Amino acid sequence: MKQPEEELQETLTELDDRAVVDYLRHHPEFFIRNAHAVEAMRVPHPVRGTVSLVEWHMARARNHINVLEENMTLLMEQAHANESLFYRLLHLQSRLVAADSLDEMLVRFHRWARDLGLAGATLRLFPDRWRLGAPSRYTHLALNRQAFEPLRIQRLGQSQHYLGPLNGPELLVVLPEAKAVGSVAMSMMGSDGGLGVILFSSRDPHHYQPGQGTQLLQEIALMLPELLERWIKRV
């Protein structure tokens, strides 16, 4: 517990600091009148012991400039990434819209992924949200929700996306015909994530890793349902 004398001293110190700051704020000419004294003032420094007030101020200014430059660089990198994302998505959309059938659209989707250096791209649809039964020719796209649920809980949790490896049993659920899959980018399709699953696969086990950006995946997951409805009706 602090003694009354200590509390009084802290109060006086606080008042003195405030008084000094207020005085300097209202009397900026102080620095002109006392230029030599200001130049001789020393400020504690963690490495050099002390530095002059002028050096201290210049160091703060340099740090501020460095922060501004870093922020500007980050903004420019983000703008470049957004531009790249926009054109990549536009390229995909223009390809898929030009398809004359669902089969052709799926081939175009797969080729787009291959052009990016991936093993391929796959769509799987939940049959309780799409009419995939006979006489539909697209029953092979159906993904049993109950069979998928353990994988979803294990890999996605509360997220809409998963990036990383899948084990053998998991691959049999979502990519039963795929071979040499090292890692995947998996996204739940639709605004509520309940329409199906989009999978991009790579033979490289380190290509997709947790923590990578998912903005492109999100945009594709929102774009595809409307295109699919040209050939498959929703339940």
Swiss-Prot record:
PANTHER family in the record: DUF484 DOMAIN-CONTAINING PROTEIN (PTHR38765:SF1)
InterPro entries linked: DUF484, GAF-like_dom_sf
Lineage: Bacteria, Pseudomonadati, Pseudomonadota, Gammaproteobacteria, Enterobacterales
Source organism (scientific name): Salmonella typhimurium (strain LT2 / SGSC1412 / ATCC 700720)
Protein name: Uncharacterized protein YigA
Matches recorded under Gene3D superfamilies: 3.30.450.40
